[in-house]
C-alpha cells in the first residue's frame, strides 16, 4: 500500500496506521500540520496495540512525527522527513530507524522511483485474483 502526495490540514487525529498491526505501507511525501505517527497505540480507544510494522515514512512533512518499531518483529523507517520528533504515546517503546531527519533525501519520491525502475526494466506485476 502506498499513500503518496497527500495533504491533511486541521486534522482531528494523527495520520498513520490505526488499530492492530497493519503491515508494510509507504507514506511518500505526506504533508500534515498535525501528527504523523507509526507507534504503539497502547489501549487507545478499543485496544489499538501496535498500529503498524514495516512502514516507511519518506520525505514527509508534519508538525510532529512519531516513528517507533516493535521490539522483535519488524522495523519502521522515517527517512528525509521534516517535523518535530516526538516520543509517542508510550515513551518506553524503541525508536524506528531515523535517517536524514530534517533534510529530504533523493529520490524525492520512493514510490515514483520504484515504479519508474520497474517499468524501465520491463517488470510487469499481474494482480492475483482469488
Specify the residue positions occupied by each region the protein language model found.
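Acidic/polar loop patches that form or flank catalytic/metal-binding clefts of enzymes
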Residues: 13-14, 34-39, 64-70
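Long terminal segments
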Residues: 42-130
Amino acid at each position: 500500500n502506498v499513500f503518496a502526495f497527500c495533504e491533511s490540514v486541521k486534522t482531528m487525529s494523527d495520520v498513520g496506521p490505526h488499530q492492530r498491526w497493519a503491515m508494510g505501507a509507504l507514506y511518500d511525501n505526506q504533508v500534515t500540520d498535525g501528527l504523523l505517527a507509526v507507534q504503539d497505540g497502547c489501549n487507545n480507544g478499543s485496544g489499538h496495540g501496535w498500529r503498524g510494522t514495516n512502514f516507511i515514512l519518506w520525505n514527509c512533512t508534519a508538525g510532529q512525527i512519531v516513528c517507533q518499531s516493535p521490539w522483535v518483529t519488524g522495523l519502521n523507517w522515517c527517512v528525509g522527513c521534516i517535523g518535530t520528533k516526538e516520543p509517542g504515546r508510550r515513551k518506553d517503546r524503541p525508536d524506528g530507524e531515523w535517517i536524514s531527519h530534517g533534510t529530504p533525501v533523493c529520490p524525492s519520491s520512493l514510490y515514483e522511483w520504484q515504479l519508474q525502475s520497474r517499468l524501465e526494466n520491463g517488470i510487469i506485476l499481474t494482480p492475483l485474483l482469488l
